[in-house]
Structures are given as structure tokens and as C-alpha cells.
């Protein structure tokens, strides 16, 4: 560290790499290889991208990290659906416990001194899984595509100038009919898909998965949606009180109103590219937006966004230009 006593001698740090150095750092045989989360990281903060993917500094792993819990929960659902197909939402308590117990067997062997803590995690995940399956039962009952693939590996190439952009990753779930398919991505929160987030590069996953799956399977894309694994309960208030009158009045709230609120909150959020109601018994499974792009618009815009982000990366940009509050939970802060 250098103590600077005169402001006239201070220079603002230049957060940039030379283009030559950036090429050596990020390119291999004229190919830029990256995951979707990598591009999203750069869109959110170029400096974090440089630290993570240029310097290869990884953040410490914490068992209590909510992202790790989400990954475990995701894998539990994947195991259940592989074993029981669409009937995974009908499994009993013992079947759920067996799957979760198997997930933690290795951890118990490696960390015998943490067995009680691990058992507590199993119980917590058991309760959470049961609640999630109850919530997903309504969707699976009224949704009539079949689960085709889970954790499907993909790679997608975009020719650009005299080089290639190679994107790769895993698609959580692909459902299909004879002619069409739909993409689902599991999330631990109530994530929504917004056009603004897609256009600024911070929400590219569903779009990329859809484009890659269409290229691989040559089926018609009907939509791409998030499946929320958040299991927060909806509070039922038996009465609504009006204090604006001299004598407060109460109005009874029927349980059906609360159930309708719950169903509304559990709609899957995302974009539809075709009339998705063809594959539904109910019209309240999905939340779709009027401004959702068509698939052709999506593909064209996606190529433009990805190439712009790649160009910015290779230009040497490592500035700390980040989203609001992005530093609050950043491992590199």
C-alpha cells in the first residue's frame, strides 16, 4: 500500500486490460468458451468476472449457503422424477426420506462428528420437499407434456468475426410432446423473467436453454419458465377489519380467496412463444407477459447480446460497474 498525502499525485485506477492480454487470458484457438452464468456475471460486474474467470479466485464453500441447499433440493427433485416420472408428486414420506438420506450418506461417513447436524438438515429438507411436492402437484396434474430430459448438457456455438463463441451448460428440465417442447429451470426464489434483464445480459439462462434445445431437438419451442422451490406459506386471515368507520366493521374472508391467492402466487413465471394452453387443463398455471418476444425475435436478440458481452470482455473491461447493492453479498468485496 502507498500512502498518498497530496491529492494531485493520486491517479484513478485504470480498470482495464490491454486487448492483447485479454485475448491471451480469455481466448483459446480463436474460441471464447463460457457458461451462461459467466456472461451474466460479467453483465452484473466486469470486475467480479475478471476475479472469478481471469484470476480464478473461487469463493469459500459454506454448507449453510442457501445456494448449496438449493442445489441439493434440486438434485432430490431430479432423483424423484427420474424414478417416479410424473408421479413424483405422489410419493409418500418414506420414499422422500430414502432419497434424502442417500444424498447425505457420504457426508455422514466423511464427517461423523457432524452426524446430529446432518440429521437436522435431513429433517429440514424432508419437510421442505414435502411442501414443494404439494405445491407442484397441482401443476403436474394439469400439465400434459412429458418429462423428456433433466440436467441435459448442451453446447451452442455462435460464429463471430473470425472466431467462435462456444456456450455450454445444463438444462434443468425439458418437457416434450410429439411436436413441441418447453424449458423449465428450478430456482430457490420467486425469480421472474423480465425483458429489461434479458436485454442487459443479466438474465440469459432461459433464452439460451430454449435456443440450444431447439437446435438439438428440432422441435417447436412453446415456452420457458422458472419453477420456484420457495415454500413460504400463505397466511389465511379469517377476517378483514375496516377501522375507517366510527364503529369498525369486519368482513369474513373465505378460505377459497386465500387458496386463489396461493394459486396465483405459484404460477410459473417466464415467456410463452406459442399458445401454451394447448397442453394445460387449467389456464392458471403460467404467468405470461404481453411484451414477451417471439422465438425468432428472441434468437436474434440473444445473438446480439452475447456477441456484445463477449466483445466487451475481450476489450479488457474489468471496471467495477455493478448492479445496485451487488456488493452487499459479493464474496470478493
Predicted features, each with a name:
Residues 91, 212-333:
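Metal-dependent nuclease catalytic regions and adjoining charged, substrate-binding loops involved
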Residues 29-32, 49-58, 74-78, 102-113, ...:
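Short acidic (Asp/Glu) and glycine-rich catalytic loops that position anionic groups and cofactors
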Residues 60-64, 116-124, 157-165, 191-204, ...:
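Short, contiguous acidic/charged loop-to-helix segments that flank catalytic cores in large enzymes
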Residues 145-216, 229:
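Non-catalytic protein-protein interaction segments used by genome-maintenance enzymes to assemble
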Residues 7-8, 14, 47-48, 144-148, ...:
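Beta-sheet entry/capping signal
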Residues 75-153, 157, 287-288, 296-299, ...:
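A non-catalytic, helix-rich entry segment at domain boundaries
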Residues 31, 38-47, 65-72, 92, ...:
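Secondary-structure capping and boundary motifs in well-ordered enzyme cores
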Residues 1-79, 262-275, 279-282, 302-316, ...:
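C-terminal, charged and often intrinsically disordered regions of DNA end-processing helicases
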